[in-house]
Curated annotation (Swiss-Prot):
Mg(2+) 2 binds at residues 105, 258. It catalyses: N(2)-formyl-N(1)-(5-phospho-beta-D-ribosyl)glycinamide + L-glutamine + ATP + H2O = 2-formamido-N(1)-(5-O-phospho-beta-D-ribosyl)acetamidine + L-glutamate + ADP + phosphate + H(+). Substrate binds at residues 82-85, 104, 230, 301-303, 522. ATP binds at residues 35, 482, 519. The lineage of its organism: Archaea, Methanobacteriati, Methanobacteriota, Methanomada group, Methanococci. This is Phosphoribosylformylglycinamidine synthase subunit PurL. It is found in: Cytoplasm. It is an enzyme of class 6 (ligase). Its EC number is 6.3.5.3.
Amino acid sequence: MDENDLKYIEKVLGRKPNHIELAMFENLWSEHCAYRTSKKLLRMFAKTVNEKTSKNIVVGIGDDAAVIRLKNDICLAIAMESHNHPSYIDPYNGAATGVGGIVRDVLSMGAKPIALLDPLRFGDIFGKEGDKVRWLIEGVVKGIGDYGNRIGVPTVGGECEFDSSFDYNNLVNVVCVGLVKENEIITGKAKEPGLSLILIGSTGRDGIGGASFASKDLTEESEEERPSVQVGDAFSEKCLIDAVLEAVKTGKVKAMKDLGAAGLSGASSEMCYGGGVGCELYLENVVLREPLTPYEIMVSESQERMLLAVEPGSEEEIIEIFKKYELPASVIGKTIPEKRIIAKYKGEVVVDLPLDLLCEAPLYDREGKEDLKEKEDDKEKIKMPEDLNAVLLKLLESPNICSKEWIYQQYDHEVQIRTVVKPGKDAAVLRINEVYPMGIALTTDCNSRYCKLNPYVGAVNAVAEAVRNLATVGAEPIAMLDNLNFGNPERPERFWQLAECIKGLADAAEFFEIPVVGGNVSLYNETVIEGKEHPINPTPAIFVLGKVEDVEKVPGVLDNKIKEGDILIITNETKDEMGGSEYYKVIHNTEEGRVPRVDLEKEKKIYEEVREVVKEGLVSEAVDCSRGGLAVALAKMAVLNNIGLEVDLTEYNKNNLRDDILLFSETSGRIILAVRDENKDKVLSKLSSAYIIGKVGGSRLKIKINEKDVVNLDVEEMKKRYYEAFPKMMGEL
């Protein structure tokens, strides 16, 4: 907080806040809690929620998680969070507690957590910070795996992007999906006075100041802030999940909140302010792990804690449930009619603040300055390599394209036995037994390099790719969350990036008719070293939830598998759009060129058509063309299915592109489908922009252009490169 904030607080209060109240303001007025920079910009998302898109929204923006109706009374709670700063300082605990926190956000809605996804960003593994990057990867992946596995929630998807801009600020974003019946939904808003407040879990000294720590740049001295990183206990969280779900079944729980950022001061004030009441807290009743002062009790961010508002008279019944699971639980206060937070310690009032002041921080009006980095490429300088086989193999080994099996094999992705399509594909698919054969598809997306070059276009691309990924499994997008990861917004160029990305996400989501129902903003992902600024690439990571009508029709499921003789069809044309492409970066070390543009009208039609042919069970495999372009998508189709492909792009090359541009351009709107020969005419009749490019068979990937074999590779060789690259990078092969 700055001097103006302090003056404003003193003016409204008519006095100076005491040291506990000041700490509460510092946390609740932090960027992390109050969205002081972004709140005005986030209003752009309002246009995505309209009469058509809102019909299945049960709980929208403003709670710990959004709740979406899937079918009948079966609903899904969804939430997305970041744990970026803590995961750079202490990767294992930072990532583990990120998982714990997002699981509790979903749990606080009364939902059983059923899936996790983890969009991750790390620095250049081959660069000068390579050793640190490996250390961060090991810690983050182990933290996510250990915590998720121990609480019995499968990690079914995510992504992992590498770029030198993340050398000093890795990103750990986490998504959780939970299942809840509509009549058992709990919100985070206590709406009546006289409710008893029960705190579950014990409070220690860990994580004090975590919210304010997450609201500033990292510096060379940030290592000293390790105490701001919380420490998780997955076994306690597993007990907490089971106990909370049992307590919800009593019907006595009226509101519930996870104790995350700002600890008890945040959870109690937000719960009461959101419901239009106040609260009185008795801090001596809080169960402590060690002797703490009232100040420490109010701002501790100890993990595995929940605040419940319950019917008066039901306290003993609720506490007994938690005792059964050996979890500390105590009545620590009550809701009151006055919209204030009053905290007492052994009879003495230590906090007395109006909630509207505490929970409504003044918003910033920041200035933006255009910083468009996209520029034309010079094809005279960027020559086509002679050996395109070598180029494709090198791309299959690049960190952004190679298999991330090394990561996801550390996660249990099949616990709860719902997983139909596992990690490694374009979207995860889970069956929802309560409404079988219906299921859900889950995807996270963002190409931060596109967003650096052209933030608006990059953000539109993220939404288009998510919709495309869902189309490959026949899923209709029904809700979207965003996790906005940016540098220091006090610098006009970064604020401009933030505004442009939000505008791009909002415009694309509105066009594709996907309501944006929640998310998270993580700013100050920027480090200053010896006076030099190191901001991350703007990274508006998104999660899109899709509805699958029949999981048995999804390509690759049951007998619906790719086989010899299948015909290969591609949607949309390929254009010269090389800006930010993996090919240009890895092979030519440049980011020049035009970032792919999304033709919203055309692509919406393509995705709807692909969705329909997949839903009819006419597609045996579907692969999204994104990083690495058409050649990489074909290679991955061959590798993942252990089968050869014979492709001829001569007729398809309508734009007479140079061979390398045709193979590696990342034009949006392209999906490669494999279909049975007897179904090809039916499929083509349903697609408005589609071309036959080859067939499935043999043991090699052969790509011809104008009678010339431009690619001819053994599938086994491609598999070796694709699967061994990451373990080699981590020093294990």
